[in-house]
Amino acid sequence: MSYLDEMFGLDGKVAVVSGGAGAIGTVMSEALLKAGAKVMVWSRSQESIDLALERLSTVPDSKGRLAGLQVDAGSEEEVLKGLEKTAESLGVPDILINGVGGNIGKAPLIEQDMEIFEKVLHMNLVAGLMVPTKIFGKYWIENKIKGSIINLTSMASYNPLSGVWAYDAAKSATLNLTMGTANELAEHGIRVNAIAPGFFIGKQNKALLIDQETGEYTERGKSVIAHTPYGRFGDVMELAGATVFLASDMAAGFVTGVSIPVDGGYLIHNI
């Protein structure tokens, strides 16, 4: 076994990637697969799962190490059933990626639709962290499993973005809860960390960053580039390294409660 395989290899590991059919979730799933882990992709949409599995099945030697499951991560009952089904089909999971999240629209404070506000909070904070972390944490403690949880924080975890009130609140809370849950679960050998993606153009934010008529950057898109020392948007594949690092007990066995920005320097633009 090479040094890199020993340090970063995930052979024998079983990962659940909640929200694993999204753009970021698929990349994280692919990274874990390539590092040797078995991967169960969770999503509410079977169609999305099928599309993700079609792509992920091209990873060499993925047969028998890859599956998908329709799970609502905001439901304690469904998450527990999903965990049990994963254990039956791939083995007991010891890695959890909390990848559910997103935003719906943008509005001035006084025009914010509170129904949408609550929906975004639920998506990012309840389904995107609390429910899976609670269920997996309990299962791991009862079965004496030293697991690893990776949450998704955001640039909004550190500084609020304009007009996305619920997303700002949820991602700030995600950073706080990453530290809080890491502190509480540490005595059980469970690590909790996060990755904070910078600005990556995807389905949910494309309209905010790129003018759909001209194909040019919007004013917001230009502002992001101007505040990013690397001078560009990120590529989702650039999240793979941090994913494998945090999942590895050898490489990150003494790392817990941290959020790793993968942002091209966005957070230090004012230095």
What are these regions (language model features)?
Residues 154:
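Residue(s) in the substrate-gating loop at a strand-loop-helix junction
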Residues 112, 160-168, 180, 208:
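Active-site loop-to-helix junction immediately N-terminal to the catalytic Tyr of the SDR YXXXK motif
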Residues 133, 170, 178:
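Active-site helix of classical SDR
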Residues 14, 21-22:
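Conserved glycine-rich cofactor-binding loop
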Residues 128-131, 194, 216-251, 255, ...:
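C-terminal helical subdomain
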Residues 2-6, 103-106, 244, 250-271:
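Short C-terminal tail/terminal secondary-structure segment
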